[in-house]
Amino acid sequence: MGRPGNRLKQFAAILLFAGLAACAGAPSETQAPSPFAALSASANGNGFSENGLAALDVAMASAVDDGHVKGISTLLVRDGEVIHYFTHGIRRAEDQAPVTEDTIFRIYSMSKPLTGVALMTLYEDGAFSLDDPVTKFVPEFADIKVQQGADANGQPILAEMDHVPTMRELMSHTAGFGYGLGGDDPVNQAFRDQAVLGSPDLDTYIAKVAGIPLLFQPGSDWSYSTAVDIQGYVIQKISGKPFGQYLQDEIFAPLGMTDTAFFVPEAKRNRFSDVFSRNAETGEQTPLDAPRFAYREGAFGMEAGGHGLVSTLGDYARFCQ
């Protein structure tokens, strides 16, 4: 239907994906001409300095050569034209396969803008108001409590919500939800203890979140949170489609984003980048092979709007434009 193409307009987009890992000696390989090259325009003619772009390439290559990341890829797009494209390093440790223009990366929190746009398509269709209570779509949240400190034994003191979080608060990280990515408070610790982000599906995820108190009264503060994952569930409830299917129908397919999804099919596994862990003391970086990093169909857990997608540089450029 093409609707997102009219909405996603930016003056310029610089995209950077990095496969984190590698020691300083990781090989650099010259790539075959990029499919982007046919679309390229003069950098100077589009307001960018050739010298500046060359310096960008040096800086990106240094991130690999100095052992900070395993591989890196950058793409500069303006007004629908590819101005500059660069890769350096490898995507896979086993055979030292280089990063290429079609390498598939785990994009983690860059999933969030896609979820946000998907939710806004429903908003523009009149499916919800910013002042709607979240419980209109997630009734499981009606009885969530609010943490208000701890007692002498270290147990959380809980209070009633003074109001149910609104969609506006959910969409601005002011609803009060935790996340579990940091913080030693009982709320974020509960997210970790219950492996909330590792839930097998969105229904299980929502049930877990409903049992964990808010960090603060809705609207009273800001905290980077699991709110975008909740937004994915709201999209599912409003649309009547699985969240991933809604993304496919309303964003990926109209924009021609053929490599963006919550899993990597077998036919594309060779293009999938490793994810690496870096030893802070030695600098050594090794690929992680736990199942949660594999992103295989049927085994990737919930469709997480906040962190769960994979994509390519080209796909994300289409989205940004």
Regions found by a protein language model. Give the residues of each.
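Bacterial N-terminal signal peptides that target proteins for export
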Residues: G2-A12
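C-terminal motif of bacterial Sec signal peptides marking the signal peptidase cleavage site
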Residues: A21-A22
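Acidic/histidine-rich, surface-exposed loop or edge segments in extracytoplasmic proteins
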Residues: P33-N44
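Short, conserved catalytic-motif segment at the N-terminal edge
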Residues: G45-I107, A127-S129, D143-A150
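Active-site SXXK
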Residues: A54-A61, T74, G80, F105-V138, ...
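Short beta-to-alpha loop/turn elements within the nucleotide-binding domains of ABC transporters
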Residues: F86, D132, K241
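Short, surface-exposed loop or secondary-structure junction motifs
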Residues: R92, P139, D143-Q321
